[in-house]
């Protein structure tokens, strides 16, 4: 499983602080205790800051991960959905029309949606007028129901043998009250060149997620790298034509970084098998920002006995 969907002002303020005056970085060993200050290349800092700015912009998009307002598991064959108090055994949403419509599942497991009369909705950006079949997020083009003039979005998820509705809204408190991202100082010593060791074609790796689902994910190979004279390995997920994706934990997990681990991406290796792991770009999964995501967890192979004092720190939400 790859991360669902595979990632302003605060970011730019951080960038100004990083680039102002004498540009200093902190180079640290695996323990993070013996730090020696060194001049850091301004071009490197600018690259890292540009990435951080884009990361923040992606999170704060009207349909970004901070916009999630609901994850509703569908346990019955039929559910009315809406925000009204009289929705009964249906799915009560945090935003939207009091009564939006009816979800129904047939014997094959296919879900259909019938909109409530008089409610203005869209399906994939076009006006929704009648009963439709919904494609879940395992489809290359999942169905998207829009409401509140496009500020709200509903999608169908499939996790193992369970189905759920995910609801997003641009007015989500987690988005409007977002507290900003914090990082360890950008450090070029954490941009590490590793060696890609391919697995036999078709190999998969079981990946669990935060809601208890176990899925077999494409596992093309492992990346071996060194830090402070020690060798480490990270199992990669992904398929040719995409980036390598890593779900990892380290000794900062729960001690500075998000307890359930972080994500990291890297370019697919070339013929020489070299892979650059930039741990400055290790980032939090969506579950660090919302209760309504279904994030993959690090496999045992990717739990590093290493203090990775680089990348994104744990997020402290002002929304409870």
Question: Where do the PLM segments sit?
Answer:
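Surface-exposed beta-loop interaction hotspot
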Residues: 148-215
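N-terminal pre-domain segments of enzymes
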Residues: 33-72
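Mid-length scaffold segments of soluble, non-membrane domains
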Residues: 103-108, 214-257
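C-terminal motif of bacterial Sec signal peptides marking the signal peptidase cleavage site
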Residues: 24-26
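Bacterial signal peptide processing site
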Residues: 28-31
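Extended, aromatic/histidine-rich regions of cofactor-dependent oxidoreductases associated
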Residues: 183, 251-254, 265-267, 274-276, ...
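Bacterial N-terminal signal peptides that target proteins for export
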Residues: 2-17
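Forkhead-associated
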Residues: 68, 73-141
